[in-house]
Amino acid sequence: MGSRAHRSHPWRDGRNHGAGVSRCLTVHRRRIIMGHSFGGAFVQLLLDAGFGTAGVSIDGAAVKGVWALPFSEIKATFPVLRNPANPHRAVPITETDFHYAFTNNLSLAESKPVYDRYAVPVSGRILFQGGFANVTPNAATSVNFANDQRAPLLFIAGGNDHILPPAVQRENYEKNARRSRAISAYRLFPGRSHYTCGEQGWEAVADFALDWALAPVAGDLGHG
Protein backbone atom coordinates (compact mmCIF):
# COMPACT_ATOMS: atom_id res chain seq x y z
CA MET A 1 0.00 0.00 0.00
CA GLY A 2 1.15 3.51 -0.70
CA SER A 3 1.27 6.34 1.82
CA ARG A 4 -2.11 7.66 0.68
CA ALA A 5 -3.79 4.37 1.51
CA HIS A 6 -2.14 4.34 4.91
CA ARG A 7 -3.52 7.79 5.65
CA SER A 8 -6.99 6.81 4.47
CA HIS A 9 -7.16 3.70 6.65
CA PRO A 10 -5.01 4.45 9.69
CA TRP A 11 -6.30 1.59 11.83
CA ARG A 12 -5.51 -1.13 9.29
CA ASP A 13 -1.75 -0.71 9.10
CA GLY A 14 -0.85 -3.46 11.57
CA ARG A 15 -3.06 -5.98 9.81
CA ASN A 16 -1.80 -4.94 6.36
CA HIS A 17 1.79 -5.33 7.54
CA GLY A 18 0.92 -8.77 8.87
CA ALA A 19 -0.64 -9.68 5.52
CA GLY A 20 2.56 -8.67 3.78
CA VAL A 21 4.61 -10.83 6.11
CA SER A 22 2.13 -13.66 5.57
CA ARG A 23 2.68 -13.48 1.81
CA CYS A 24 6.43 -13.72 2.38
CA LEU A 25 5.94 -16.74 4.65
CA THR A 26 3.60 -18.57 2.30
CA VAL A 27 6.47 -20.29 0.52
CA HIS A 28 8.15 -21.03 3.86
CA ARG A 29 5.14 -21.92 5.98
CA ARG A 30 6.96 -24.38 8.23
CA ARG A 31 9.14 -21.98 10.17
CA ILE A 32 9.79 -21.06 13.79
CA ILE A 33 8.54 -17.49 14.27
CA MET A 34 9.86 -15.25 17.06
CA GLY A 35 9.15 -11.62 17.82
CA HIS A 36 9.85 -9.01 20.48
CA SER A 37 7.45 -6.32 21.74
CA PHE A 38 4.94 -5.63 18.95
CA GLY A 39 6.75 -8.38 17.09
CA GLY A 40 5.38 -10.71 19.74
CA ALA A 41 1.83 -9.66 18.87
CA PHE A 42 2.64 -10.24 15.19
CA VAL A 43 3.80 -13.76 16.10
CA GLN A 44 0.35 -14.43 17.57
CA LEU A 45 -1.38 -13.06 14.48
CA LEU A 46 0.74 -15.23 12.18
CA LEU A 47 0.25 -18.40 14.22
CA ASP A 48 -3.49 -17.72 14.36
CA ALA A 49 -3.45 -17.50 10.55
CA GLY A 50 -1.83 -20.92 10.29
CA PHE A 51 1.82 -20.05 9.82
CA GLY A 52 4.80 -21.48 11.66
CA THR A 53 5.74 -24.69 13.43
CA ALA A 54 6.18 -22.81 16.72
CA GLY A 55 6.06 -19.21 17.91
CA VAL A 56 7.82 -17.28 20.66
CA SER A 57 6.55 -13.92 21.90
CA ILE A 58 9.33 -12.14 23.82
CA ASP A 59 8.00 -9.33 26.02
CA GLY A 60 5.11 -9.18 23.57
CA ALA A 61 2.56 -6.41 23.17
CA ALA A 62 -0.98 -7.28 24.20
CA VAL A 63 -3.44 -8.47 21.60
CA LYS A 64 -7.14 -7.64 21.77
CA GLY A 65 -8.68 -9.29 24.82
CA VAL A 66 -5.71 -8.82 27.14
CA TRP A 67 -6.68 -6.21 29.74
CA ALA A 68 -3.67 -6.10 32.06
CA LEU A 69 -2.40 -2.51 32.26
CA PRO A 70 0.18 -2.02 35.01
CA PHE A 71 1.14 1.51 36.01
CA SER A 72 4.64 1.18 34.56
CA GLU A 73 3.12 0.44 31.13
CA ILE A 74 0.92 3.52 31.35
CA LYS A 75 3.92 5.64 32.31
CA ALA A 76 6.09 4.19 29.53
CA THR A 77 3.53 4.73 26.77
CA PHE A 78 2.03 8.00 27.99
CA PRO A 79 4.50 10.22 26.07
CA VAL A 80 2.92 8.90 22.85
CA LEU A 81 -0.69 8.26 23.89
CA ARG A 82 -1.19 11.61 25.61
CA ASN A 83 -1.57 13.46 22.30
CA PRO A 84 -4.57 12.49 20.11
CA ALA A 85 -2.70 13.80 17.05
CA ASN A 86 0.06 11.22 17.43
CA PRO A 87 -1.62 8.40 15.46
CA HIS A 88 -0.88 10.43 12.36
CA ARG A 89 2.84 10.96 12.84
CA ALA A 90 6.09 9.48 14.06
CA VAL A 91 6.84 10.50 17.63
CA PRO A 92 10.42 10.91 18.91
CA ILE A 93 11.38 9.50 22.30
CA THR A 94 13.57 11.33 24.79
CA GLU A 95 16.61 9.74 26.43
CA THR A 96 14.83 9.79 29.78
CA ASP A 97 11.69 8.11 28.45
CA PHE A 98 13.76 5.55 26.54
CA HIS A 99 15.70 4.71 29.68
CA TYR A 100 12.51 4.17 31.68
CA ALA A 101 10.73 2.11 29.03
CA PHE A 102 13.53 0.01 27.60
CA THR A 103 16.91 0.14 29.36
CA ASN A 104 15.95 0.58 33.01
CA ASN A 105 18.46 -2.10 34.03
CA LEU A 106 21.27 0.16 32.80
CA SER A 107 22.52 3.43 34.20
CA LEU A 108 21.71 6.57 32.23
CA ALA A 109 25.31 6.65 31.04
CA GLU A 110 25.14 3.01 29.90
CA SER A 111 21.80 3.64 28.24
CA LYS A 112 23.08 6.56 26.15
CA PRO A 113 24.88 4.53 23.42
CA VAL A 114 21.89 2.18 23.20
CA TYR A 115 19.61 5.18 22.76
CA ASP A 116 21.90 6.68 20.13
CA ARG A 117 21.92 3.43 18.16
CA TYR A 118 18.32 2.29 18.37
CA ALA A 119 16.00 5.17 19.27
CA VAL A 120 14.04 6.49 16.30
CA PRO A 121 10.71 8.32 16.11
CA VAL A 122 8.11 5.66 16.83
CA SER A 123 4.86 5.17 14.94
CA GLY A 124 2.14 6.68 17.06
CA ARG A 125 -0.41 4.72 15.05
CA ILE A 126 0.77 1.30 16.14
CA LEU A 127 0.71 2.26 19.83
CA PHE A 128 -2.81 3.62 19.48
CA GLN A 129 -3.87 0.44 17.65
CA GLY A 130 -2.55 -1.67 20.49
CA GLY A 131 -3.59 0.61 23.31
CA PHE A 132 -7.20 0.93 22.21
CA ALA A 133 -7.68 -2.54 20.70
CA ASN A 134 -10.13 -3.63 23.40
CA VAL A 135 -12.56 -0.86 22.47
CA THR A 136 -11.99 -1.05 18.70
CA PRO A 137 -14.26 -3.26 16.57
CA ASN A 138 -12.23 -5.56 14.29
CA ALA A 139 -9.01 -4.35 15.89
CA ALA A 140 -5.80 -5.08 14.00
CA THR A 141 -4.55 -7.19 16.92
CA SER A 142 -7.57 -9.52 17.09
CA VAL A 143 -6.76 -13.22 17.48
CA ASN A 144 -8.78 -16.33 18.25
CA PHE A 145 -7.63 -17.49 21.69
CA ALA A 146 -9.59 -20.73 21.15
CA ASN A 147 -7.75 -21.71 17.96
CA ASP A 148 -6.92 -25.38 18.53
CA GLN A 149 -5.06 -25.63 15.22
CA ARG A 150 -2.39 -23.00 15.80
CA ALA A 151 1.23 -23.94 16.36
CA PRO A 152 2.73 -24.06 19.89
CA LEU A 153 3.18 -20.62 21.45
CA LEU A 154 5.58 -19.52 24.19
CA PHE A 155 5.32 -16.23 26.09
CA ILE A 156 8.59 -14.95 27.57
CA ALA A 157 8.37 -12.21 30.22
CA GLY A 158 11.04 -10.00 31.75
CA GLY A 159 10.60 -9.47 35.47
CA ASN A 160 11.83 -5.87 35.30
CA ASP A 161 10.12 -4.93 32.03
CA HIS A 162 8.43 -1.55 32.46
CA ILE A 163 6.63 -1.13 29.14
CA LEU A 164 5.21 -4.68 28.81
CA PRO A 165 5.44 -6.20 32.29
CA PRO A 166 4.96 -9.86 33.24
CA ALA A 167 1.28 -9.30 34.03
CA VAL A 168 0.65 -8.69 30.32
CA GLN A 169 2.45 -11.85 29.24
CA ARG A 170 0.83 -13.91 32.01
CA GLU A 171 -2.72 -12.90 31.08
CA ASN A 172 -2.05 -13.53 27.39
CA TYR A 173 -0.66 -16.97 28.18
CA GLU A 174 -3.55 -17.87 30.50
CA LYS A 175 -6.19 -16.86 27.96
CA ASN A 176 -4.55 -19.08 25.34
CA ALA A 177 -3.96 -21.97 27.75
CA ARG A 178 -7.56 -21.99 29.02
CA ARG A 179 -9.29 -21.69 25.68
CA SER A 180 -7.14 -23.63 23.22
CA ARG A 181 -5.96 -27.23 23.16
CA ALA A 182 -2.85 -26.10 21.30
CA ILE A 183 0.38 -25.92 23.31
CA SER A 184 0.75 -22.68 25.28
CA ALA A 185 3.66 -21.95 27.60
CA TYR A 186 5.00 -19.18 29.81
CA ARG A 187 8.50 -18.45 31.08
CA LEU A 188 9.57 -15.62 33.37
CA PHE A 189 13.14 -14.30 33.34
CA PRO A 190 13.42 -12.35 36.62
CA GLY A 191 15.20 -9.02 36.60
CA ARG A 192 15.27 -8.57 32.84
CA SER A 193 14.11 -5.36 31.15
CA HIS A 194 12.40 -4.77 27.81
CA TYR A 195 15.90 -4.54 26.34
CA THR A 196 16.28 -8.23 27.14
CA CYS A 197 17.46 -9.12 23.62
CA GLY A 198 20.39 -6.72 23.91
CA GLU A 199 21.39 -6.54 27.54
CA GLN A 200 23.91 -8.77 29.26
CA GLY A 201 22.73 -12.36 29.49
CA TRP A 202 20.61 -12.25 26.33
CA GLU A 203 22.08 -15.60 25.28
CA ALA A 204 20.15 -17.41 28.02
CA VAL A 205 16.88 -15.99 26.72
CA ALA A 206 17.73 -16.82 23.11
CA ASP A 207 18.86 -20.36 23.93
CA PHE A 208 15.74 -21.07 25.96
CA ALA A 209 13.48 -19.73 23.20
CA LEU A 210 15.12 -21.87 20.53
CA ASP A 211 15.32 -25.01 22.67
CA TRP A 212 11.63 -24.70 23.49
CA ALA A 213 10.64 -24.04 19.87
CA LEU A 214 12.43 -27.21 18.76
CA ALA A 215 10.66 -29.31 21.42
CA PRO A 216 7.58 -27.41 22.70
CA VAL A 217 6.01 -28.24 26.06
CA ALA A 218 2.97 -26.64 27.66
CA GLY A 219 2.49 -24.87 30.96
CA ASP A 220 4.16 -22.42 33.31
CA LEU A 221 7.83 -23.26 32.86
CA GLY A 222 8.98 -21.36 35.93
CA HIS A 223 11.75 -18.80 35.95
CA GLY A 224 15.46 -18.78 35.24
Regions flagged by a language model, labelled:
Residues 93-128:
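Conserved alpha/beta-hydrolase catalytic His-Asp/Glu region
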Residues 162-171:
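Conserved alpha/beta-hydrolase "acid-adjacent" motif
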